[in-house]
Amino acid sequence: MALRLTAKQAAGPLEITKTTGERTMSQIRYLLQLAALAAMLGYALPSSAETIIDEWQNIKAPPPPQLQAVTLDPKTTALIMTDIIKQTCNNEMRPRCVTSIPKIEKLLTAARASGVTVIYTLFPSRSPATFPNPVISDYIPAVAPKGDEPVVTSFADKFMLGDKDTGLQKILKDKGITTVVPVGVVAHNGILFTAVEAAFRGFNVIVPVDGMAGNGPSGYDEQATAHILTDSIVYKVTLTSLDMIKFQ
């Protein structure tokens, strides 16, 4: 705080005038008083002790990502049919999966006709005594495998089973695949983790949003998956829909 002394003041008590610094302090005090008043009226900012769970109902969903039409080269594209079996794709657990079957079947038919590599996945049971290990015959008939189409078994990340390679990477590389299209269940497990891992491994990843199903009818799992897949600077995933995919 600056002091201004006149000749008169030099001979007597000092008179201190308000400077810029003093005015700033007054403004700060005024703002603090306003904040205290706002708190009393219930308009205070959220407490630092609040968590994302406390704020759950007040969080607004981000804008929806844009879907893109894609034309894929059959020679370098693989369609990964992910766990579309009766145990996981039914009206009780995942009604969206059931309603997506006709469109997935249409895409599968077009893929086979164009010579696209089709790969199937299963998952091992964590409790075989109460939930037997799924087998390939559990696939929904409309989208079941044909001939010698390969099958890999894993949990969410279809490239790895624990610390072991599932063979998916080798299948893709041996066939010259550069683009993968995972469809099926579950959106926030098998689709999400396989898509991200494929992107990390250098593959182009195309995910049809109406070809993945989460738990229940709400659509929250699918929305969250779509947001995560497209909101990263580390990996790139293209979102599309089943009828926006062409092979040429």
Language model regions located:
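Cleavable N-terminal signal peptides
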Residues: A36-L37, S47
